[in-house]
Amino acid sequence: MKVTVIEEPLLEFGKGTHICPRNGIERMGVYDTKDELRRSELRLGIVGRGEGVDKLDVWLDLCRSGIVGKESELSNLFKGFGGVSADYGFFTRLLSSPGFTRALQKSSIVKVSRIKTREERVVAAVNLYYEQVQFLAENRAIDVIICVIPEELFLSLTQKDAGSKKDTGSVEQYMEHDF
């Protein structure tokens, strides 16, 4: 058997190249900082229930402020994260506002969660969020829209239908969510 080792390519960043994405962003900024039309703000639209939106706001604050790295002999493994700010790394500000947020009613979530078949629940949930996403896209100057899915709705969308013999898997198989 013949084995060929391919050298890992250098990644391009705003002010140079580096092999590591984290180090490259930290030291040289993201690639599009070279773009003269690049915006310095990222406006976030949010669709979800109150509690989930509040948790997302806390998480976004953590993203803005940064995360301290862990002590380790492997210095590159548990590096800190400097945060998302206009002065560092991503060179942008994350902007969220109540005016960019669309709240879903609990009664609407419960109604979708009680639909008998999973397929119909998924379609109803997509339609529920789509109305609010469409409003934000058409009426606000938004760059990214984040859909916050309440746990009750998430569980109803990831569980098998009542009476179905096919199991869709456990919640643990899905990405961790806490919004």
Model-derived features with residue positions:
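Long, low-complexity, intrinsically disordered terminal regions
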Residues: 1-179
